[in-house]
């Protein structure tokens, strides 16, 4: 399988971080201008937090199913 789970766990945060650096280089008022939801900068700050948290809880749920299925 080309996109395995360990590869995605590393690849998704790196892509999110690249998006964060891209918006930091494009936006003139990067830290202060990120408060509006219409700004691209807002979502580039939201993605690096949302995606790893989603992956963590997805893996946590999967581990819970794997552990408690055997009892």
UniProtKB/Swiss-Prot annotation:
Ranges that cross the membrane: 4-26, 45-65
Gene Ontology BP annotations: GPI anchor biosynthetic process
InterPro entries the record matches: PIG-Y
UniProt membrane topology term: Multi-pass membrane protein
Topological region Cytoplasmic: 1-3, 66-71
Keyword Membrane: yes
Pfam families: PIG-Y
Pathway it works in: Glycolipid biosynthesis; glycosylphosphatidylinositol-anchor biosynthesis
Subcellular location(s) of the protein: Endoplasmic reticulum membrane
Entry GO CC: glycosylphosphatidylinositol-N-acetylglucosaminyltransferase (GPI-GnT) complex
Principal location: endoplasmic reticulum
Lumenal compartment segments: 27-44
Coiled coil: none
Keywords in alphabetical order: Endoplasmic reticulum, GPI-anchor biosynthesis, Membrane, Transmembrane, Transmembrane helix
The keyword DNA damage is annotated on this UniProt entry: no
Miscellaneous comment text of the record: PREY is derived from the same bicistronic transcript that encodes these 2 different proteins.
Description of how the protein assembles with itself and partners: Component of the glycosylphosphatidylinositol-N-acetylglucosaminyltransferase (GPI-GnT) complex composed at least by PIGA, PIGC, PIGH, PIGP, PIGQ, PIGY and DPM2. Interacts directly with PIGA; this interaction regulates glycosylphosphatidylinositol-N-acetylglucosaminyltransferase activity. Does not interact with Ras proteins.
Function: Part of the glycosylphosphatidylinositol-N-acetylglucosaminyltransferase (GPI-GnT) complex that catalyzes the transfer of N-acetylglucosamine from UDP-N-acetylglucosamine to phosphatidylinositol and participates in the first step of GPI biosynthesis. May act by regulating the catalytic subunit PIGA.
Name under which the protein is recorded: Phosphatidylinositol N-acetylglucosaminyltransferase subunit Y
Organism: Bos taurus (Bovine)
């Amino acid at each position: 399988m080309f996109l395995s789970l360990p590869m995605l766990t590393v690849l998704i945060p790196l892509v999110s971080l690249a998006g964060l650096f891209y918006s930091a280089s494009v936006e003139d008022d990067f830290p202060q201008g990120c408060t509006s939801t219409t700004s691209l900068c807002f979502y580039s700050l939201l993605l690096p937090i949302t995606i790893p948290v989603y992956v963590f809880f997805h893996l946590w749920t999967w581990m819970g199913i794997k552990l408690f299925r055997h009892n």
